[in-house]
Amino acid sequence: MNSTTEINHEKLMELFGNVFNDVAGSMAIMMSYLGDQTGVYRAMDKLGPASVEEIAKESKVDERYLLEWLSSNSGRGYVTYHDDEEKFSLSPEQAAVFARENEPTCIQGLVQGVVGQFVKEDIAVDVFQTGRGRPWGEHHECCFCGTERFFRPAYAGHLLDEWIPAMEGVEDKLKKGAKVADIGCGLGTSSMLMAEQYPNSTIHAFDFHGPSIDEAKKRAAEKGLDNLEFFVSDAAAIPNESYDLACIFDAWHDMGDPVGVAKSIKDTLADDGTFMVVEPMALDGLKNNIENNPSSSMFYGFGTLICVPASKAQPVGLGLGPQAGPKKLMELLSEAGFSSVSLA
């Protein structure tokens, strides 16, 4: 073997171990999905330390399968095994991650989104090989529901208390009564939060995915929100309503022509209107992201499977991706004609 191609055994085993752990983790993701969809985690949170029989009865699942599932979860540290009593439970921390929907640390939306990518893996392979785009609506419904569940805690925890107050004068306008455009609203979580918090304001929410808008309308109707309307619309076709605030939450990078969209939004704003863009956490530059952003690998993965293909399926097809970084995003906003751009 040529000296330049000799394998460093220590590095080989380190890499093999890392990949093996990733494979084990992928199995754990599927176990987590089973526990979420069947209600086992929620049943365990309700019961406290309980036998396999008790958990199976409460969650209405097969007892033998449950034992195997609990054993797998115990090995990953997802549930707690009490050897002296032969019972299983969730610690408060485990419950906050796996069982409690409204906790900011609930991981199940992310799990759901990942599982959805394995449902139509043949399409992912074809897209990767051919370079064609993949429209958002071509994904399994787990992608839509999982995305909403993943981002919901962040919006609930930060949108009203941090992001909106960080923009000078915007919150006062919303309290008095303003016009808001929520673009790329998906299932409408951000739209409903603003409509509930600011009843004097009118919220118009837009998304090009019809089934998501249908579901958002149902959810808004259940809440009785009469200051919120949903529309099926391309992001670049928002009507000129002189909006006081236009928002895009974690969707700008998915758009085929983000500069063109930003230009269109600029035209729909009132003279003193504000455009707020929220994007996934990213740093400037690949090396910087790899070394200093622990979530970058995951988001580059989502970019490969979802975000870049969604962009390439639209006119222009820039393929910005979810890890473009603040410098690039601010350059694009400046290109779109926004003269005052600040990073909050």
Please state what every model-predicted region is.
Residues 6, 10, 18-27, 31-43, ...:
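Conserved Class I S-adenosyl-L-methionine-dependent methyltransferase catalytic core
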Residues 259-271:
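A short glycine-rich, Lys/Arg-flanked "PGG" loop and its adjoining helix->strand segment in the class I
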Residues 338-344:
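Conserved S-adenosyl-L-methionine
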Residues 44-48:
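Short helix-to-turn junction characteristic of helix-turn-helix DNA-binding domains
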Residues 107, 116-253, 258-262:
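Conserved adenosyl
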